[in-house]
Amino acid sequence: MEIGKNVKRYDVLREHGGILKVTRGDVTTEYVSEFCGASHSRTQKNLFVDRSIKDKLDDILLCGIPKNTDYPKPSKWNAYYALVTTNSQPVSMPNIVVIDDFEKLVTETVDVVKLTGTGEQKEYQVLSPTEKEIPILPFDGAGLVTPECASRWAEELDCRSKRTGRRYIPSCFQFRCLPAVKGEAFTFDLKQFAREKGVSKIVDLGGREWDIFTDQIDMIVTKSQFKFWNLYLDNVGLFDCQKWKSAFEEEVHGYRRTFNVAKYADAPEDIRNTSLLSYQPLQTVRFTPEEAEQLVSDSVSTYERIKSSVDEFLKYCGVSEEAEYIKPYYQALQYNHALANDTYVRGKMQDDIKRMKNELLSGKQRIHGHYEVFCPDIYGLAEFAFGLEVKGLLPNPWTIYSKYWTERGVSEVDVIRNPHIAMEHRVCQVITSAEMQKWYKYQECTIVSSMYDTLAFALSGADYDGDTVCTTDNVQIINSVKRVMESGNGNLIVKDGESGKELKSVIISDVPGLMEVNARGYKNNIGSVIDRVTDLWTLSELYPECRKYIKIGTIVGAETIDFAKTGENASFPVEVLKFLKDKKKGYWMRYLEKNLAAAQNESLSMSNAEYFGGDPDKKKRFVDYDCNMNRLCHLAEQKIAEIDKQTEVVAGEEFDYRTLLSGNVHVNRDVYRKVQILQDEYKKLADGIRASYKSKDKNEKANISLRYRMFYEKCRAELLYIVPDIDKLLDMLILIYYTKRDFRDNQKSKDLLWNAFPEEMIARAKSENINKQVDFKKLSVKHHKNNLAESKKKRTGKITIASIDRSDCADNEVIFYKEDREEIRKLILKHKIVKRSDNQVKYERLIAVLLYLSRKMNMQTLTLRNNCPGELSYQNIAMLADVNNDFIKPALKSLKECGAINIETMQSGDLKIDVLYYGKPFGEVWFCTENYNQAGVKIRDYFRMDKAA
């Protein structure tokens, strides 16, 4: 269930025991709140399960933990209990030893932010830099697995190189195990280590001694990985590993628990040599003019190659690198370069090239470097596990081991991590030795870090449970980071003081109590914190106080991320919010994907302000401040403009659609009609998704992809039901889409063709036979299901205005009187707004619709949004009045000039409309309804051409 920012409905569910009733036909099913993990909380979602299975599900997931357990940190419980919802694959159960965490102190000069108070009274004070001892967990989130066990898992998971198909043993595995045992297991030869060091005994977290050989230990798990270790204690309060193992191995309700792997490291040959670095790491440094020129030139040269070569374009799309998903038309383009001149494929290429252009203009840079899993000094972890002095193999701070960079002779890299708020860069020396190559033998795709520095803390509080870091040898970035560090502006930022708020414990079976914690978590938004810090970086060269505010933002960001541990919300202090209140965004931000609509709206609002009377300059949303990102943006603009003048989008040989045909066919009339219907459905689906798309959250993207995939599967089934011969059908579809006027000139229309029949279209591009048999029985079942689904959802002719439906005025009945009709007609005639009778009817309908909506909203201001099908928009007003969309804007201007309405243009380009003409609410009733669709019918039926004056 998606909660969103409005938690009123969620509160009602909480008050009713967290039970959600869903009715399908005549059957009502009760669902109950069960999971709200960290990712759910970030996206304001809650996972409900069928109430009838909840008790059994809890019996399995709790793994022996009593249901009446009173847990002191409910936010942590919610986060870890929901780990089971992540996707993973079962592997053979390892023999595990759970050991304590190793702690140590490192001394470093840090910037301190002192925290006092709690909640809205929380205050942040930035203190002077000071030298301080920082406690660290050098192996936080990390464990070790023997090569023998790793080899078994690799076989069970079928770990193969994406590029070559070679079997390999991954450097590490991200694992999941009940209850809430999670982290990264790094491949390390524990037994060889024990033999060479002459040791074999390992003491676990509860003080019990194990022998790696006689007990056949496969894996070492640290306390930081076993989240609920303190719920498995013996009579004297010590961790009892056997108590957990017995509960884990017990069969419950016919279910046997498993040890699972969620992800594992790539094969070395699959590592990409380049990465697209986001704007965040670039905004925290300052480049010299020469550095900026070189950095932008390197990225723009990639743009030039992609634009001028089909092969380079395909390489950019990942076709030659076995990416997880390649769009079917690009797979086809790999075999038939002539498709680059097909208007549909060419349009897709232009869209992707434009997307890359916007990435460059928004400051993103393509660099030599890549992401790998962040790894601790696992030699030191092995020393600790066997009770030896913990030294590790990386003896100095700010050193790393990387097989990738060592093989390329690189001795210095910048290490970067997102989310990047303050200055999550650290320049490290790449070192190696014979001992490192021996003991880090399996660490082919990780960045091994030293235990003598605060690198993990500096990288936005990273740990070793699967976090990834980017490393690059880019000289411009490395030199700029060094300058920042030398100036003292790159110190580690730490918090002094904790919240004084006492957190209330919750019984883990108390569903409403846990939901209350969820509701608090929904208020947190790390994205908004990062956005505000970005604004501060944009202004930092103009306003010295921004540096102080950025340090505060770093702590606010850390507190927001740590909600699962603390259960307390975090927000910027009022001082910072007041500073940012009237500040515009940087010019470069207009090119960010999330701001493209805002940039268009800026142009629209400035145009509207000029059109309706106002100051266009006040509508500007992006300002050309003197800052690092704006300078990079302008450099990219200049270079890309020069390339665009000289280079057309790549053109191959001439394309002839007939090369995709396999024979001579005539288009079946039923197929043509069905394609028309499906195209209309596709447009409605795409419009609806576009209107409701709110974020770039991967879960939302996955949901959107699923909706499209289900639609394409429906299209495939419906068309094959008409013509089961797939070769004939495909020939008909190709003829329809390439020769029929309704489709050939519509660039997006071929989405259905390429996505409903992807493999077949690729085969046609390769001039291969399809030779597929269609199972008509299965096809008939799908067709029947599609018909049932279609009949359920048909609501012909109705629109939805969500802003009204979810408001307090949703149930308001509106009375229209016959006198209203006459007054509306008099208004139009009196002011001589129109001369033609057909336009008179349109104006009458428009003012009647606006008057109805205004009365329904208790005469509140109406917000008219641009291109938002689910809101009060030009489109919905036009549909209610049955007029053309293009008619609305000039008509509103005329109504404003005659005093019927007042219009204010917003920064977004939206219009605020106050209906000044109230009508005369008295006399004989014309109609009374709370339904705006019914009101639209009444208005359209009365104001007609045959009744015009």
Where in the sequence are the language-model features?
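Short, cationic-aromatic polyanion-contact patches
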Residues: 906-938
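Beta-strand-enriched accessory nucleic-acid recognition/scaffold domains that flank the catalytic cores
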Residues: 1-461, 468, 474-849, 864, ...
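Short amphipathic alpha-helical elements of helix-turn-helix/winged-helix folds
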Residues: 848-856
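Winged helix-turn-helix DNA-binding recognition segment
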Residues: 789, 858-916
